[in-house]
């Protein structure tokens, strides 16, 4: 899917957490209803069959419970998308990325071929529909997640190019697929953050480490031979740049991808480089924007939400620009776009006990008009307000309420913006207050069963707060838009 990802190492975050976050976006002209749920080991089959590619994969024993963001409407696969398992390992998948004809000609994508005449069908590989479901219930560390997914890619292949993030309390790893069966992965340095639009991003790779100590780099078993045989290394100095070797530098990237990376890097490092003007080090169309940077200050969840909601505020490219030169207005693809399905920010807090370490921040619909809210991830069930999404528009769940707020606020932007700013701050503040309150209760409780009940009680309280504030905001935004109707008239009846 068309998405945007941010990864924050533990030394770059405000509290020592590892944080991984992704906007999950539908393709143009589509919207996908999502629900926040828990998948239990007994719900997993012995053999997995993909709806889209028809590939069948036997699943191992020893599964773990995990949270997920599956599609609310059945029929096109699970698309679990993002979650945290019972071992406090987080995963988000996938960020659709780009490739080039040299790679795809050497290792074609493994696409499903339907039966034709007397020829039987040929299953395809794995894809975004499948990846979280196939990996997250079976791993106990971020590195283990890379190795399991890498093994599946080598055995079954994939029909699309994807980037996938894994985290535990100590590490974050980022994996990128290369062609049908190859892959690379890099450990995110502790003191940096990573920004990822929809293109292959890793810009340095140490093959010696990947085939040696494997401290910071991992890859498919025959990657070195694959590169040499197909003349993929374009460097003049022998330092492999995966972005040049395996990625793209298309004109479309300069409208759809590089501007997003430019804006996020500019936000966290405004003084490190010159970002605008004739003497700019980097522009929205630069192909060499860094994959990772050390931020100028520590990064908070609120920073991540702002970046993943952005539409180039403060630049000539803002689609909501209402003054000055508007010639570049809306020139680039926004990060907070109309077709954001959800955003999940997974936070592993090192200063909390393992049982309550993982917090999952959730937002639905267009990030430019929503708010995110924290929930304890180590639970048996999620609140109904976030889990009861269906394909029918309704105001008794967070997904559809968020969609309605976004559509109406977009149409009444200048009038509704302050309602949205107050809504977001109120939910973030109240959500943090409730987590702080229940962290203290959990620390004081010695009984494990009671602590489990407290985590679910906390999530219920957070959801109740959220539902009240979302309904209030919907009411206010509806009023603003109703007041702008074309059949309005200023005189009241006598």
Please place each PLM-identified region on the residue numbering.
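A contiguous strand-loop segment
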Residues: 2-128, 148-280
């Amino acid at each position: 899917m068309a998405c945007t990802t941010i990864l924050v190492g533990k030394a770059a975050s405000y509290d020592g957490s590892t944080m991984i976050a992704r906007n999950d976006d539908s393709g143009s002209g589509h919207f996908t209803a999502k629900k926040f749920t828990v998948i239990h080991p007994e719900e997993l089959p012995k053999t997995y069959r993909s709806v889209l590619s028809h590939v069948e994969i036997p699943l191992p024993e020893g599964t773990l419970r995990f949270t997920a963001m599956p599609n609310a409407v059945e029929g096109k696969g699970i698309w679990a998308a993002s979650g945290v398992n019972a071992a406090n390992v987080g995963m988000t998948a996938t960020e659709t990325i780009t490739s080039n004809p040299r790679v795809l000609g050497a290792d074609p994508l493994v696409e499903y071929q339907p039966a034709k005449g007397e020829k039987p069908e040929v299953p395809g590989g794995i894809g975004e529909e499948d990846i979280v479901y196939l990996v997250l219930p079976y791993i106990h560390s971020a590195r283990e997640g890379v190795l399991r997914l890498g093994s599946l890619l080598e055995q079954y292949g994939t029909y699309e190019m994807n980037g996938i993030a894994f985290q535990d309390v100590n590490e974050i790893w980022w994996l990128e697929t290369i062609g049908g069966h190859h892959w690379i992965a890099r450990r995110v340095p502790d003191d940096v953050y990573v920004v990822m639009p929809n293109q292959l991003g890793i810009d340095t790779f140490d093959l010696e480490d990947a085939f040696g100590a494997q401290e910071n780099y991992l890859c498919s078993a025959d990657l070195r031979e694959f590169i040499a045989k197909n003349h993929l290394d374009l460097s003049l100095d022998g330092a492999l740049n995966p972005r040049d070797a395996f990625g793209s530098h298309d004109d479309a990237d300069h409208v759809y991808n590089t501007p997003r990376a430019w804006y996020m890097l500019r936000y966290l490092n405004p003084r490190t480089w010159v970002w605008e003007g004739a003497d700019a080090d980097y522009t929205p169309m630069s192909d060499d924007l860094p994959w990772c940077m050390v931020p100028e200050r520590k990064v908070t969840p609120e920073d991540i939400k702002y970046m993943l909601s952005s539409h180039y505020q403060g630049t000539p490219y803002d689609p909501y620009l209402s003054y000055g030169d508007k010639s570049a207005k809306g020139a680039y693809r926004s990060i907070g776009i109309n077709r954001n399905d959800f955003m999940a920010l997974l936070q592993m807090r090192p200063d909390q006990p393992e049982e309550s370490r993982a917090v999952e921040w959730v937002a639905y619909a267009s990030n430019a008009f929503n708010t995110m809210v924290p929930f304890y991830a180590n639970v048996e069930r999620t609140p109904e307000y976030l889990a009861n999404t269906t394909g029918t528009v309704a105001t008794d769940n967070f997904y559809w309420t968020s969609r309605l707020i976004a559509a109406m606020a977009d149409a009444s932007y200048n009038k509704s913006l302050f309602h949205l700013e107050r809504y977001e701050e109120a939910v973030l503040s109240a959500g943090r207050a409730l987590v702080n309150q229940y962290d203290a209760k959990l620390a004081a409780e010695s009984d494990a069963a009671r602590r489990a009940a407290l985590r679910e009680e906390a999530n219920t309280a957070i959801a109740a707060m959220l539902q009240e504030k979302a309904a209030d905001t919907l009411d206010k935004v509806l009023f603003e838009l109703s007041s702008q109707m074309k059949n309005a008239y200023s005189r009241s009846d006598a």
